[in-house]
Amino acid sequence: MSGIDGFVIAPKPTAYFGAGSIERLPAVIDAIGAEAVVVVTDQALASTPVVAMVTALLAEAAMPARVFSGVHPNPSTDDVAAGAAAVAEAAAGAAAVLQAAAVTATLRASAPLVSPSAPRGAPVALVAVGGGSAIDAAKGIAIAAVNPVRGRDLDCRSRVNVPALPIVAVPTTAGTGAEASAFGVVTDPAVPRRFYVGHANSMPAATILDPVLTVGLPPEVTAATGMDALTNALESYLSLHPNPWSDGIALQAIRMIAANLPAAVADGTDLAARSQLLLAAHMAGVAMSNTGLGLCHAIGRSLGGRWNIAPGVALSMLLPDVLRFNLPVRTQRLADASFALGAGDTGATADRNAAAAIDAVAALREQVGMTALIADFGITEADFAQITEDALDDEVLASTPRPAAPSDIAALLAGQS
């Protein structure tokens, strides 16, 4: 007996990492075999050289692209519906119709350019350019464009009959790791509440990790997205469902983020630090896709959906307190993480190293300027019951290592007031 529970290793999507890797985009689209391309992004990024570069590369390869720039921070179901309409317009100009998305073509000789499960011969491919908002919205759009589902019916538990359109993810932040997951988070503005969209077949066909595209990020965005990635890695490592493969990836991601986030915040042109952060964020995404997340994300998503707080900001506010809450059941793992965080002492006890890990996370948060509290967003004790209700209904709690009662969540929130 190995002493290790069985688990599945499914390393997807195919990822291209390195400065200049965006040049591979036309070849990746060609491998998918799409007849039209829609770039999914946000309004701010649409006017930058990043999107201009993407569209120019595609145009030079005789792959003219339509740009949909209607994604908002914390994207909504309205964004998804508008994006699906833009895709329908793009498809109308292609030789195929949207129903052809159900076709599963024979793998091409160039198949290694994309993940083996990626649909080929689809009429439209989506290129999601941006942070987690653009990539998450693209997953909803990829489904809604070929299925009659809108609004809350986009929930990941809903049945879809036609496979999602293929997505190529081009992250421009080192944060959410959304490019490594088949699922995303969008807000239903009618509630308002965030929920999960996606399906097994909405995993990006490929992702392009070009650190040059992250150089223009301002310090506050670099800090917030970096803390998002750190939360992903830590919650993966502390998950109720760990495995040795994900453990190794998560610990290395923690190590890379702790070592490079301050440098990237201090000097946004530091390409070495940017490269380490972008790869680490992707690794954290791979790890969490195999283990799930936890309480920090459950609470953070309520804050994002109801108060429009950016994910990295919400998570960084909560992370040290959630780590302390998990300490009784994850002492050894936090002790192990202390060494990845640069705070471990080989002569210290597990208890002391675990505490040092939490202190190191809090210190890193302060160092990169993430000092906000939930009270700064107008959240009061009167809101705690709603946040608690949202958090306890979040699917990620299936992976949290220590079950939380309503009183536990209220206490965590009270510490932020």
Spans of model-derived segments:
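Short, amphipathic C-terminal "tail helix"
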Residues: 380-417
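Glycine-rich phosphate/pyrophosphate-binding beta-alpha loops
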Residues: 175, 282-315, 394-399
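ATP/NTP phosphate-donor binding region
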Residues: 1-93, 118-125, 374
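Flexible, glycine/charged-enriched surface loops at secondary-structure junctions
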Residues: 240-249, 264-276, 291-296, 347, ...
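Carboxylate- and glycine-rich phosphate/diphosphate-binding segment that chelates Mg2+/Mn2+
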Residues: 154, 183-291
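Gly/Pro-rich interdomain helix-loop hinge
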Residues: 306-383
